[in-house]
Structures are given as structure tokens and as C-alpha cells.
């Protein structure tokens, strides 16, 4: 894999990380708007995404892995997203994406539609204000699995349907071009793929 097949995210990027990312043509996904000036010191990414904190998050495995919401330390908070994309556009970047992390180990199918709606409201307003479009939207992960016998598994079909319904409605509401939708299944694929033997 290389180039735009790779989305490069990181919290603590070194100058070398940035230079190698620019040289290889990967998609830069910035976790903090303050990283943009550092990246621009070395060059201009062809495609830029920000990790948007939708202002709400949930975790079924403890509050320290909530990943989104008012107290989360990751992602661009809702009130700073417009300024982040405005700065990127002003710097001459023309191709954009958006990313979020909705939470961790969520097994409530309707939650994914809800959190997608929050993200779409934020970036829909950004797109309309700045007259930019989003080539892709990475809805992150958070797809949960049961860890105890009494826990119900995630209904993945219902989660997909809820997400698609909300996404279509918001695209129409904000007059957005349909983006490529992506997810990061992570734990959902590998979390129950083996046994821990002690």
C-alpha cells in the first residue's frame, strides 16, 4: 500500500514523520488543528483530513477509552472545526476528508446513526460555509463485541442501516456530494478471534 491508500494519523508527529508522509503522498489525518502549521512548514498534503470530535462519545469498556466528547483529549472540538478547515483551504489545500472516533466497544446499533448525524452536521456546515466538499468520511471504529455471556452482540446490519439512513438525510440537507464512507472494524473483526490461556 502507498499514497492515498494510506491514511496517516498521529498524535505526536516528528518532523521526520511529516516529511516522510509528504514524500509518500499519504492522506494526512490531523488529530489537532495546531498540527497544520507544522505540516505546512514542510509542504502541502494533497489530501487533508481532520479527526473531528463530534462533541459526544460513549464507551462500554470504561470512560478512559471514550475517544470523543467534551472531555476527550483527541480530535478537533466542534467549535474549532470550521477554523481548522478554513486554515487548510487558505493554505491552498483543495482536497478534503473528515474522520471521527465515535467511541469504544459500542453494541447499541442506533448509536452509530446518532453519532454519524453529529459529525455530518459539523462538516455539512463547514462544507457549506467554505464551499468545500469531502471526498471521504471515515466514521472510525467503536464497533463492539460482547465480553460476557449476558451481553448482546452488536447487530451490524442495523448499525449499517441506521448510519446509511442518517448519512443520506444529512447529505441532502447540506447539499453535499456523496463521499466515500469508511469504517475501522478493529476489535469487531479480531476481538473474539482467539482465546487467552493463563
Question: Where are the regions that the model predicts?
Answer:
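N-terminal active-site wall of soluble small-molecule enzyme domains
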Residues: 1-24, 38, 60
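Glycine-rich tight-turn/loop motif centered on a GG-T
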Residues: 3-5, 22-27, 62-76, 108-113, ...
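Hydrophobic faces of well-ordered beta-strands that scaffold small-molecule active sites
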Residues: 4-10, 26-30, 48-52, 95-102, ...
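Active-site-proximal loop/turn and secondary-structure-junction residues that shape catalytic pockets
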Residues: 12-14, 32-34, 52-56, 78, ...
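Amphipathic, non-transmembrane alpha-helical secondary structure
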Residues: 15, 19, 23, 33-41, ...
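Conserved anion-binding
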Residues: 24-25, 32-94
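Gly/Ser/Thr-enriched, mixed-charge loops and adjacent short helices
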Residues: 87-107
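C-terminal active-site-proximal or functional interface alpha/beta core segments in diverse enzymes
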Residues: 104-198
